[in-house]
Amino acid sequence: MNFALILFILTVITGIFWIFERTVFLPQRRRKAEEAASAFEAANREALGRGDAAVGEDLRRLKATALRQPWWLEYTAGLFPVILIVFLLRSFLFEPFRIPSGSMLPTLHIGDFILVNKYDYGIRLPVLNTKVLEMGAPQKGDIIVFRYPMDESVDFIKRVVATPGDRVEYRDKVLYVNGVEQAQSRPRDFVDDSTMVTLEERTENLSGLEHSIAVDHRRPSWVPMQAVMKKESTCSYNDRGFVCTVPECKYFAMGDNRDNSEDSRFWGFVPDENLVGKAVCIWANFSDMGRIGSIY
């Protein structure tokens, strides 16, 4: 479901009703309210002259009834300001997402609700996703949300491990960027609550940014070369891992749950035009509210 498109359509439809409400329907109701009030005052001039409170209240209710929006305008024009604010916030500032899988463990858990910054990587037109203003670019270590290159109706979340021009290598479960080993330290046990499997949690220093990764010793370090990657002349695979050089305007992204993540190793690079934004914090997890906070 393309929620951005649905929200855009709702904004346009309610906006049209709001314009007609302001320019046509509201002036009509005001005119009718004035006519009804004039007729009522003419018929009850004596009582109003005496200051009859009951008649005065009837006049007030008459005006309020004549000015009241019909239900179909309440649910269209009346909702437009709220829908417009949501649309603008979601399109240009922040968008919420829910983590559906364990591919980013131990950093992000299933059920985490995260907030994604929509402007760090440039201002884009809603729905079209066309960049109209350059702001910045993903850096190594950023957790990004992007449209899955194999099915752009689906959003993925992974960590950027290499940027355009970088040579990235994953060998024997260790990451190398431009020939430099991204050091791993402090191994300890980590239990994946969704599968009840014990993984090894390590701290990886990715170009100066320390973050947690999970290693599954039940799985090999190599991954089968998918058909899409066979077309990439800058990548090679062997029984110990792979080596890739990242093309311009593309990024290499991997899940922190290194052996249980379908990522750039399988389906290729993330194009710049597929970027949605940068994950900045966890704002809710209804199973564990203690997880609320920054993810860096």
Which sequence ranges carry the predicted segments?
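Short surface loop/edge beta-strand patches of beta-sandwich-type extracellular domains
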Residues: 102
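Soluble "head" domains of membrane/secretory-pathway proteins
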Residues: 2-50, 57-72, 98, 106-296
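Transmembrane alpha-helices and immediately adjacent membrane-cytoplasm interface residues
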Residues: 68-98
